[in-house]
């Protein structure tokens, strides 16, 4: 029996892609009869400030894990201890904070610039969600490729072509409201596209920064559960995701899984799973976004996207994680 310590702290703070990764991983791991899982959580920002979380709780986590006789400790985001006598796995979803520091608050910028090299050095293995993210970790954190494990994200059962669809005529955007997600340019591109009769529906949690969305033809839906999100994908004329930087881009894969045409930035990491399926645009150019939206709406349903997305499952991702844990515990 392998005893795994799993940091689930981010679930208290986010409902975005990181939360999807943690909840999907945890659900799969709990079905593994040969694993015993010890969850760790600092309890959310109401109980500890960001500074205390990063400077007190995480440094103490390996000692707690040793007392609990944990065989492997897995920190599910880049926030992790700087040293650990327990074999340590750290998931780095992306390095946006180093590539685009202006898109983050001051504490996150300062802490990440200082902490990430230490975290990368302490980790026995670093999990990344794409080959692009692997290259970023190697370049920016000087981590050798042999300590990096690429385990792509997956899609769960709700996201499939057949099933209930949301009513209405709309373009769907799934994104946290924060500067890096590039929503103002998406909205401008939507307005320029001239898609008569369609509204833009925005799904996602509040983020940070002065991101203003709204106006005629724009409807904010906030956070929805997975079943409702799948309904929205299936009912959409197209989905659009034009973030300026991602390690993976899970909404693109989820739209594909529902056979919904999807607009996405050209290049990496999207071309690792959406090449030839997504309608590629320049996310810095509203006219390019507008053209992509028009093409996607005209293109209709995309069964090839669903077939491509079927290669990416959370079950496969979970098994890859389990294999890594066993390797480190051996």
For the regions a protein language model found, what residue spans apply to each?
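Carbohydrate transferase catalytic cores enriched for Leloir-type hexosyltransferases
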Residues: 1-330
């Amino acid at each position: 029996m392998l005893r795994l310590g799993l940091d689930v702290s981010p679930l208290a703070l986010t409902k975005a892609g990181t939360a999807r990764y943690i909840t999907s991983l945890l659900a799969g791991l709990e079905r593994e009869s040969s694993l015993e899982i010890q969850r760790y959580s600092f309890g959310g920002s109401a109980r500890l400030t960001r500074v205390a979380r990063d400077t007190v709780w995480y440094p103490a986590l390996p000692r707690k894990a040793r007392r609990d006789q944990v065989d492997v400790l897995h920190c599910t985001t880049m926030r992790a201890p700087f040293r650990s006598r327990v074999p340590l796995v750290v998931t780095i979803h992306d390095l946006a904070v180093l590539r685009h520091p202006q898109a983050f608050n001051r504490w996150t910028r300062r802490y990440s610039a200082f902490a990430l090299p230490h975290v990368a050095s302490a980790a026995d293995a670093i999990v990344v969600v794409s080959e692009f993210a692997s290259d970023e970790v190697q370049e920016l954190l000087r981590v050798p490729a042999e300590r990096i494990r690429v385990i792509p994200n997956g899609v769960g059962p709700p996201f499939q072509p057949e099933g209930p669809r949301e009513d209405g005529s709309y373009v769907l955007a799934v994104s946290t409201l924060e500067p890096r997600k590039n929503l103002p340019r998406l909205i401008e591109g939507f307005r320029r596209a001239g898609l008569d009769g369609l509204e833009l529906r925005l799904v996602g949690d509040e983020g940070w920064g002065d991101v203003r969305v709204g106006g005629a033809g724009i409807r904010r839906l906030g956070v929805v559960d997975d079943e409702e999100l799948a309904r929205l994908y299936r009912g959409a004329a197209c989905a659009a995701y034009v973030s300026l930087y991602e390690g993976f881009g899970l909404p693109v894969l989820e739209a594909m899984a529902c056979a919904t045409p999807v607009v996405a930035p050209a290049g990496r990491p999207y071309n690792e799973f959406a090449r030839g399926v997504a309608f590629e645009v320049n996310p810095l150019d509203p006219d390019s976004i507008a053209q992509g939206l028009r093409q996607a709406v005209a293109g209709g349903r995309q069964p090839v996207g669903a077939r491509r997305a079927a290669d990416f499952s959370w079950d496969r991702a979970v098994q890859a994680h389990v294999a890594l844990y066993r390797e480190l515990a051996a």
